[in-house]
Amino acid sequence: MAAIIDIIGREILDSRGNPTVEVDVLLEDGSLGRAAVPSGASTGAHEAVELRDGGSRYKGKGVLNAIAAVNGDIFDAIGGMDASEQIQIDRTMIALDGTSNKSNLGANAILGVSLAIAKAQAASLGQPLFRYIGGPAARVLPVPMMNIVNGGEHADNPIDIQEFMIMPVAAGSLADAVRMGSEVFHTLKAELKSAGHNTNVGDEGGFAPNLASTEEAIGFIMKAIEKAGYKPGDDIYLALDAASTEFFKNGVYNLQGEGKKLDAGGMVDYWADLVGKYPIISIEDGMAEDDWEGWKALTDRIGSKVQLVGDDLFVTNKRRLADGIAKGTANSILVKVNQIGSLTETLESVEMAHKASYTAVMSHRSGETEDATIADLAVATNCGQIKTGSLARSDRLAKYNQLIRIEEALGPSGEYAGKSVLKG
């Protein structure tokens, strides 16, 4: 039992050089918790509001108003509360905000405080964060979704699909999975370079070559997997994030890079064709965020054999997830803590998904920091999958390195999710 005696918010920079919120929480026993808040590039319309200052400073992206909320109204409301009362503290902040999307105080302000309090309480108890949040049952190391080719909003190239990922399901451990991913990543770099493509990386550490189509990108990845000594569709599978809301307008999916304009039925056919050709086991945001009929059609068509992940569709929001479950839409939720804006609501969304036999994928954002909280959350929730970028950029590797440490701490009790994540 330790009361909150001080909360300090500050403005720091994320991996894109934009301001974000960092919060320190100090407890009366001297324990300190620190958390930094991530930020997305392709954001769903239904996400909680990330409060930005506007004006000329930092081109409008400053977060001094959110910092003022942390140091002022939020501290006034929860200062003196016991840090072990996470749910009560989060609900107090949500009530203080008074809006459905946290647009008053800002989800970035509330989340920073929420996560820092959990870290402070874990420190007070002398427990690692994953153990404090997940209890004794927290032991599953997640299969990484490693984003090795970037397109869409994450890169300056003509590829429509935002992320091409590999999932090393046959690894014997998390550390082994990271090694396999690294080997494929470096093999892919050599293949791209030998074909005359640039090997610059995008926001999430994946390569951003000037490729002509989705299938060309997949072809390079398949070749890299094989040249690294692995078998696609056995050792390593593919996963895609279409971020299709970004190219959906007036009922049409406009794949500019490929010169295709498709209605919902055509988009479903497009995905079914790709899944038939390649070992793709997961597609995120295959349909636009409010194309519920398209999502239902996609789920009915390939949902029995492919993980269909709702990111912009669900935005880590229980109400939208409940709608999706009731409609039989998608079969998985992407979990981004800043989409909903508090630890309590994040954990509630994961619990709802699991109760409905939906999978959950813990995820970073394209604008990240050295904060590795999501690694602990992935293990705490036993969600079995994590999406945290490529094998480049320290803001991405911070999460993989933390998972390696957690696996070491768990010892023989730890279990790598591996092929248990496969459908069908």
From Swiss-Prot:
Residues that coordinate or bind Mg(2+): 241, 284, 311
EC number: 4.2.1.11
Co-factor remark: Binds a second Mg(2+) ion via substrate during catalysis.
Record-level Gene Ontology MF annotations: magnesium ion binding; phosphopyruvate hydratase activity
Gene3D superfamilies to which the protein is assigned, alphabetical: Enolase-like C-terminal domain (3.20.20.120), Enolase-like, N-terminal domain (3.30.390.10)
Predominant subcellular localization, coarse grouping: cytoplasm
Catalytic residues (positions): 204 (proton donor), 336 (proton acceptor)
Entry keywords, A to Z: Cytoplasm, Glycolysis, Lyase, Magnesium, Metal-binding, Secreted
Gene Ontology CC entries for this record: cell surface; extracellular region; phosphopyruvate hydratase complex
Cofactor names: Mg(2+)
SUPFAM superfamilies associated with the record: Enolase C-terminal domain-like (SSF51604), Enolase N-terminal domain-like (SSF54826)
Residue numbers binding (2R)-2-phosphoglycerate: 162, 336, 365-366, 387
CDD domains linked to this entry: enolase (cd03313)
Pathway(s) this gene product operates in, as recorded in its UniProt entry: Carbohydrate degradation; glycolysis; pyruvate from D-glyceraldehyde 3-phosphate: step 4/5
Catalysis performed (reactions): (2R)-2-phosphoglycerate = phosphoenolpyruvate + H2O
Places the protein is found: Cytoplasm; Secreted; Cell surface
Known function: Catalyzes the reversible conversion of 2-phosphoglycerate (2-PG) into phosphoenolpyruvate (PEP). It is essential for the degradation of carbohydrates via glycolysis.
Protein's name in the database: Enolase
Organism (species): Parvibaculum lavamentivorans (strain DS-1 / DSM 13023 / NCIMB 13966)
